């Protein structure tokens, strides 16, 4: 009886966690703005309205940042030797999620609102509807050394630029930032020391 109850509890727990994952709608790739218009209009912004960002807009943004754009699983952002070592997290009021590009879904990793922790010392940006946090998983490299750290930092930069330009095309605002409470984020996102937390983006509509 006790064993049966334990199995039922485990199943219910697993279902509860998976039920909190979010299947995103298919990204729409028909933005009217040209690349050169996006480059012309790109600007950093740190003041955001409280207007929510729909799952459709979020899906479009995440695909542009680091989505799959070829049948062989390669991404919109290049990575050294196609290592695909970049991890992208969405932090918003209802918790924190990892973007799973292959399934176009958000995998819930924390139920806490971590936006203030991502904002760090710049509390003024903490009111953004969401933050995108970009990390580099050094375990994807055959060797973890200074060279792999440099390559990882460069690859994070590609994703950051994609986010900047996609935000313009989608009518959103953002700013790339390095400051954040790394200790809290590592704990809540489940990241070890060999995951580099390098850049985050508050994202929202301009106030």
Question: Which residues does each predicted region cover?
Answer:
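A glycine-rich helix N-cap at a beta->alpha junction
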Residues: 190-207
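Short, linear, compositionally biased motifs with a strong N-terminal bias
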Residues: 10-11
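N-terminal amphipathic, basic helical "cap/leader" segment at the start of enzyme domains
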Residues: 20-128
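Short coil/turn connectors at secondary-structure junctions
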Residues: 126-129, 194-196
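Generic beta-structure capping elements
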Residues: 27, 135-137, 204-206
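Small-aliphatic-rich amphipathic alpha-helix that forms the alpha element of a beta-alpha
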Residues: 42, 61, 88, 130-141, ...
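Positively charged n-region of N-terminal signal peptides that target proteins for export
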Residues: 1-4
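N-terminal signal peptide c-region/cleavage motif recognized by signal peptidases
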Residues: 14-16
């Amino acid at each position: 009886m006790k064993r049966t109850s334990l199995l039922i509890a485990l199943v219910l727990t697993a279902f509860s966690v998976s039920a909190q994952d979010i299947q995103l709608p298919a990204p729409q790739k028909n933005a009217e703005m040209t690349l050169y218009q996006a480059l012309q209009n790109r600007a950093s912004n740190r003041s955001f309205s409280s207007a929510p960002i729909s799952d459709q807009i979020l899906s479009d943004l995440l695909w542009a940042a680091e989505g799959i754009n070829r049948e062989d699983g390669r991404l919109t952002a290049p990575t050294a030797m196609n290592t695909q070592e970049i991890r992208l997290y969405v932090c918003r009021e209802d918790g924190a999620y990892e973007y799973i590009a292959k399934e176009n879904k958000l995998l819930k990793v924390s139920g806490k609102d971590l936006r203030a922790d991502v904002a760090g010392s710049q509390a003024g940006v903490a009111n953004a509807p969401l933050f995108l946090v970009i990390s580099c998983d050094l375990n994807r490299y055959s060797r973890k050394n200074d060279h792999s750290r440099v390559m990882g930092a460069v690859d994070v930069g590609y994703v950051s630029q994609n986010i900047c330009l996609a935000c313009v095309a989608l009518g959103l605002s953002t700013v790339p930032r390095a400051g954040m409470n790394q200790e809290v984020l590592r704990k809540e996102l489940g990241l070890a020391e060999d995951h580099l937390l390098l850049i985050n983006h508050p994202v929202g509509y301009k106030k």
